[in-house]
Each structure stands twice: as C-alpha cells, then as structure tokens.
Design a protein with these regions (language model features):
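Extended beta-strand/loop cores of jelly-roll/beta-sandwich
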Residues: 28, 435-602, 609-614, 640-641, ...
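An acidic-aromatic substrate-binding cleft motif
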Residues: 61-117, 143-146, 478, 483-488
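Solvent-exposed beta-hairpin/edge-strand motifs
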Residues: 388-402
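Functional-site microenvironments in short loops/helix caps that host divalent-cation chemistry
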Residues: 487, 554, 559-726, 735-740
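Aromatic- and carboxylate-enriched substrate-binding clefts and catalytic-loop regions
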Residues: 149-295, 301, 314-323
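Catalytic domains of carbohydrate-active enzymes, especially glycoside hydrolases
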Residues: 124-144, 211-214
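C-terminal beta-strand-rich structural cap/linker in extracellular carbohydrate-active enzymes
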Residues: 412-447
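Active-site-proximal substrate-binding groove within the catalytic cores of carbohydrate-active enzymes
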Residues: 59, 67, 238-246, 250-385, ...
C-alpha cells in the first residue's frame, strides 16, 4: 500500500475549499497547462518583490491544488490522444526505462576505435566513462553527419563503411551488450539527396538494425518518429526504442518510448511534460554546448530521467568537468538503484520543502517512498528540510550520504533534517521494513562517494589542445620534375575559415594551427613560404595504377579501397580522371613511392591563390555558364567573362543527383589554372592535405571542394570552393575515410 500523503489537521478546513477549486476541472481547461514541453510550477514558487508581498512559501494545500490541476490535465490528455501504453510493457523495450546515462558517441572518437591496431576498443571507451563519471547505460553511435554528403553514400552506407563491415558492426554491438550497454543509431530523414536506399526508410531501418542487433534509433532533427517506423520494426520481430531529437506530439508517446529534452532551465524546476504524461517514458536531457552541466543534471534528477552525456560534439570536445563528472556519478548511481521508483504513476513533483531553493519529487512504490532532491541555491542548505505525515515504525534513510536519519515529530508530522550542498543533490527513502541488502550496499557506496563534497572537485572547463601531424620532407630536388609546377617561395598572408555547420566560433571548432593556442574557426597568419614543386594535376587513376603495379600495395583495411575499380583496374575512359576512394594513408603511401609528399594546407592555398588574395585560383569570377550557378554565388561579376557553353567553364559543373557522376578529367578545364599554372584545384574532387589530432578526434583538412552537391538538406558536408575556405573531414578508419569525392595531389621540396 502506498504511503498516505495526508494534510496536517490545521489545514483541514481548507481542504474543502481545495475540493471546490478543483471540482469543476472536468469541464474546463486546466490552469497549469504545459508551455512547450514543460509544466510550470505553482505561482507560490515565484519570487515577488516586497511591493508585491514578498516571497511566501508554498503550503501543502497550494501544492495539492496545483497537483490536482496537472493530474487532471494528464488524465484528460491521455484520453484525447488515445494513449496506448502497450509498448512500454514490451520486454524488448523496457530497458529504456532505466537507461539514464546515454552519450552520443562519434565513431571517430579515438577511445572507440584504434586505426593502428585496426580494431574497435569498446572496453577502453566504456572504462574511460566509468572512471570519469560512473559509466553509461546506452550509447548513440554516430557515423553520419557531419561527413555525410562528401560523396553519395547515404546514412546506412556510412555506417556500413565502418571497419569490418556488417560483421564488424555486429561484433561491436555485441561488445557493448557484454558491458551492459544498449546501442542506438541515428536516422536522418533529411537524407533525401544521396543514394536511394531502394526501399522505404521504415523497412530499411528495421531490417538493418535487426541485422546488427541494435536496440534503438535516434531521430535526428525530428519532432517525433512516425508510427510507421515502430510498426516496421515490430513486423520483422525486432522492436526498436525510438528517440526523436525534438519534442514529439503527445500522441507519439504511444510509440516513441524515448525523447531528448532540449530545454531552457529556470531556478524553479519545471515538470517534464513527457515524463508526466507517462513516467515510463525516458527523457535524456541534452545540452551539447553548455559547459556547466548543473542545470541539465538537476533537472534530470528532479524529474527522475536521464542525461545525454555528450562530449565529442561533431569532433569538438566539450568535456565534462571533474565536478560535473562526480555529480553525474552520484546521480547515475542513485537513479539506477531507484529505477523502479522513478516510473511510479503516483509521482508528486515539487513536494513542499521547508528551505528556500530546495526542490523535491516524491516517488511512492508499494510501502516505500523515495524523494529526489536538488538544491538550486549557490549556498549550502542544512537543517529542517522536509516534513511527511507521521507513521509509526517508518524509518528514514539519507541515501545520498548513506546514513539513517532520526525524524523529529512535530504534531502529526515527521520532520527530517539533513545537509545538501550548493547546487547539490539529495535522496531520502522512507520505509517501514528493514532495508534490503541492495539498499545497504547503495548506502555504503554513496557514503564513500560523498565523504568528499562536490565543491572539492574542479568546475573549470578546459579545451583540449590539437596537434598538427608532422609531414616528413620529401627528398630535395633542384629542377622541376615531370608533371609538376614550380611554386616560388614568398611572403604570404594565409587567411582561411572553417565551414563547419555548427559550433559558431567556440574554442575547439575547426583546427589549431601550430602558431595558435587553441582551435578556432577563423585563422590569419603572415608567413614565408619556401619554394616547392606541386603536381600540375591531381593524381589520376593511371598514376595510381602504376603505383600498384610497382609496389603491389594493398591496405590491411581494404573496405572501399578503389571502390569504383573492377578486377584491379579502373573503368574504361577513366585513366585521366582523379583517383578517388583512397584514404589519407593510401595517398601517403603513393606519395612516398613517388618521392613526394602531401602538401601542407597553406602550401596548397598559396599555390591556388598566389599573393593577390583572389577568391578562386583563376581570379574573382564565378566559373559557370549563363543560367547555371555554383555555391557560393556572391562573387564579383564586373570584368568577368560571360560563358556561352559548358565547355568554357573554368571548373566542373556541379553534380546534384542522388548518384554521384564520375569526376571530370583532370585536364578538362585548363582555363581554371592558378597564378602558378596549377590546374584542377577547385570543384572536381576534394584534396587531402594536413591531419590534426587531439586526445579524442582525428581530422583532415580538405581543399578545393568537389563536383558533388547532394540536394534537399542544409546538413550535408558543405562545399569550400573559395581559396579562403576549407573543409574538415573527421577521420575514423581507412574504410570509412575513403570517399568517391576525395582525391589528392603531391608536392616535392625544392633545393
């Protein structure tokens, strides 16, 4: 039987008034309807100025009035939406109800995959998170954006490009399962411009996830995953937990059993609408860019829900501070142990507390009750915290500190006193029975943790440094090698911007050049460039075939290697097209064989731009005939030629179909030469240059853009045709990094 939450006798006359207040609610709108995805607190929790009567604490009566109002809203809303709870009762999906900690993990994270050893390192990844913040319950494995669109691979092609292909994916998922971690993948319904999957996305996703035994799907940018996806998964006998990024409709809670919560937080915690409608619905609070996680964690703990512990944000490291990591460990430990309480249909949020700025939720379960508590104040709170109706034989345990409390009886109330530190947490258990062995174990664990206050842990956020991967000089040459162009040295203003879609100019966006103290989006540096020789054209298929014939080179990770070749050679008519589907390591191997090296990015830009700051290698004019446009189109037109025919274009015509067409021959656009006479630098295929690395991510700078422009979404890998722009491609493994839109050219150092 649930513990009775009785009103003290002194409030008995007012109870009738409260009943009269709420009685008409069955026939009228509620007073506290949700705003966006959050239910507002009662008015008594609003701080008023002295001229408005000052602050008056909420009473049990005002709390009951508010609770009755939002309960009425919930009951009515369930009826109006035809709420169906059957999916929350499916054994295959019940894991989601206790999946409190879920990072979005970029597949490029160096803790997840070791490209040198050529193997997934799931244990290393999970061990690191256990050490830093107490581990995870689920993981969202992200292999698509921001790289998708660099060629015509669709979202599933990108995942299948991961090392080992399907068998590698199945083993990797099994490794997470072995560690007790459920696995989700994203789906991008905005991906309508790359290769057609050949089947409807609901069926394609259901079949693929069953094949690799994944547990769920995150709906990227979606405000609800449509019912068709759940039905498709159930049809193949593999139910999936669907988790939209945005706020779904209330109706969608019948099939979307997970949700991200991307909210703005006030001092007084609001009630999560989705959690209130169905306490078994798991919400993962997500604030990818915030550096102080206190609001996220406190809101999650108050609402009994989870947190998206996302640190590697598109290759930009926004790491959890030691203080937030320790807070996460404590919140996760308590929530995992209390999971059965946190799905209680009798949840009472904003339970009346004595101390200002301390807020609690009450979670009854059979003959026990749990309170999850947060202190929103910047100062410690100690003393009389809460009252609960007196009941003979009830014992109270401070689970957070791992100690039993002695309640003070005041009339018909038991008053509990305990400390809760600034921006801290509390958890109280009321029980009439002897604590179980599990509760005793939890208390021992929490007592050990909380010997050190959260305030003892650093809350300073720090960026992690990046390093440029060195490029060994080539053998020096005194005269221009065949097929190369001399680039005389000179004074150069190297000015370039990263074109990442997200991240504004936060520290960590883009790259950190050797002369900079942090990664950032906008770069400018005056330098002296030494003379060198550059390939007049990108390396062609014929060039690469000579390399293979001479060396019998074959990479250990050969998935997608020369994907468009057959029987060891390129298609007819492709000899003079740029070689693609080669990784950075493949390109380096070719360069070493040829006595060359890959260029530093500033060398590439210097060869393309010269010293006059031109927009494109050939000047400041767009390169397309009348009636066609390139991106970007905001270029000067005064003094530019008007092309009358496609053959007159200075670079390839953009390819906007779902299937990427072959690249142009490297010598097809001689009029697009740079000031030094280097050809085919822009708009045919991207070209590998420098690699950057930090503790968690590797990336390569791509230059020149490509002919491929998938349509229908702003989220595809953006083009960088201008001389002062570059692309940043996140690296994982050769199989994944190889692309039909990326080639390379080489340089040689001059004596």
């Amino acid at each position: 039987m649930n513990e009775t939450h009785r009103i003290p006798s002194c409030f008995a006359p007012a109870v009738l008034l409260a009943a009269l207040y709420v009685a008409p609610l069955g026939a009228q709108d509620t007073h506290f309807a949700p705003k966006n995805q959050q239910i507002p607190p009662p008015p008594c929790m609003t701080i008023r100025g002295a001229w408005e009567g000052g602050y008056v604490a909420c009473t049990p009566l005002s709390h009951q009035q508010w609770l009755a109002d939002i309960t009425h809203w919930r009951n009515e809303r369930r009826i109006r939406t035809g709420f169906d709870s059957s999916r929350y009762e499916l054994p295959a999906l019940q894991w989601a109800q206790s999946a409190f900690m879920q990072p979005q993990m970029m597949v490029h994270d160096r803790y997840f995959y070791d490209p040198v050893a050529g193997k997934y390192t799931v244990d290393k990844y999970v061990d690191d998170l256990e050490k830093r913040y107490g581990g995870i319950d689920a993981v969202l494995i992200w292999a698509t954006y921001p790289n998708m669109g660099v060629d015509d691979r669709n979202q599933h092609d990108m995942v299948r490009s991961m090392p080992g292909g399907i068998e590698g994916l199945k083993q990797m998922v099994a490794d997470f399962h072995r560690r007790g971690v459920r696995v989700l993948f994203p789906m991008m319904m905005w991906d309508q411009g790359t290769r057609d999957p050949g089947a409807g996305w609901p069926d394609a996703i259901a079949a693929f996830m069953k094949q690799i035994n994944a547990d769920g799907i995150n709906g990227d940018t979606q405000d609800g995953v449509p019912l068709a996806f759940s039905l498709a998964a159930e049809k193949v006998g593999h139910p999936l937990a669907f988790e939209p990024e945005g706020g779904p409709s209330d109706e969608a809670l019948s099939w979307d059993v997970l949700t991200w919560g991307q909210y703005q937080f006030e001092f007084v915690p609001t009630v999560d609408k989705y959690r209130w409608l169905e306490p078994r619905h798991q919400v993962n609070i997500q604030g990818r860019w915030v550096r102080d996680k206190t609001d996220d964690l406190q809101f999650a703990f108050f609402n009994g829900e989870g947190w998206e512990s996302w640190e590697n944000v598109w290759g930009i490291w926004n790491g959890v501070t030691p203080r937030d990591g320790e807070a996460t460990r404590r919140v996760a430990t308590l929530e995992r142990s209390a999971a059965p309480f946190l799905i209680s249909q009798d949840w009472e949020p904003l339970y009346p507390m004595h101390m200002y700025g301390v807020f609690a939720s009450r979670w009854p379960l059979k003959d026990q009750t749990l309170w999850t508590i947060v202190n929103r104040n910047e100062y410690n709170s100690d003393g009389r915290q809460m009252s609960t109706p007196f009941k003979e034989g009830t014992r109270y345990f401070d689970l957070y500190h791992g100690v039993e409390l002695t309640a003070a009886r005041e009339g018909d109330q038991s008053v509990l006193s305990f400390p809760i530190e600034a921006h801290g947490y509390g958890a109280i258990l009321a029980t009439s029975s002897e604590p179980t062995a599990e509760v005793r174990q939890l208390m021992g664990k929490m007592a050990t943790m909380t010997k050190t206050p959260l305030s003892a842990y650093s809350h300073e956020w720090k960026a992690i440094p990046q390093q440029l991967v060195p490029i060994e000089p080539s053998p020096l040459v005194a005269s221009t090698p065949v097929g190369m162009v001399r680039i005389d040295g000179g004074d150069f203003l190297f000015k370039v911007d990263g074109i990442e879609i997200e991240g504004t100019d936060d520290i960590g966006v883009d790259v950190q050049y050797p002369w900079e103290d942090s990664a950032r989006r906008f770069h400018e540096q005056r330098m002296q460039v030494k003379a060198f020789y550059m390939d007049k054209y990108p390396a062609t298929n014929a060039d690469f075939k000579k390399f293979l014939d001479a060396t019998h080179y074959h990479p250990q990770d050969d998935l997608n290697f020369l994907k468009d070749w057959q029987n060891g050679t390129y298609p007819d008519g492709w000899a003079n097209k740029p070689v693609t589907w080669v990784s950075l390591d493949d390109a380096r191997a070719y360069a070493k064989w040829a006595g060359k090296r890959l260029p530093h990015e500033w060398e590439w830009q210097y060869a393309a731009q010269g010293t006059d700051g031109r927009i494109y290698p050939w000047g400041n004019c767009d390169w397309l005939p009348v009636g066609l446009t390139a991106v970007p189109t905001t270029v000067p037109t005064k003094g530019c030629s008007v092309f009358g025919d496609i053959k007159d274009a200075l670079a390839p015509i953009p390819d906007k179909g779902r299937v990427m067409l072959p690249a142009s021959d490297v010598d097809a656009h001689p009029n697009g030469a740079s000031p030094f006479g280097v050809i085919d630098m822009v708009g045919n295929v991207w070209q590998w240059t420098d690699e950057y690395v930090d503790e968690h991510t590797r990336a390569s700078i791509l230059r020149g853009g490509s002919h491929y422009q998938p349509q229908g979404s702003i989220w595809y890998f953006p083009q960088a045709y201008r001389n002062n722009q570059h692309g940043k491609l996140l690296l994982m493994a050769p199989s994944y990094d190889r692309s039909g839109g990326v080639g390379f050219r080489c340089v040689v150092d001059a004596k």
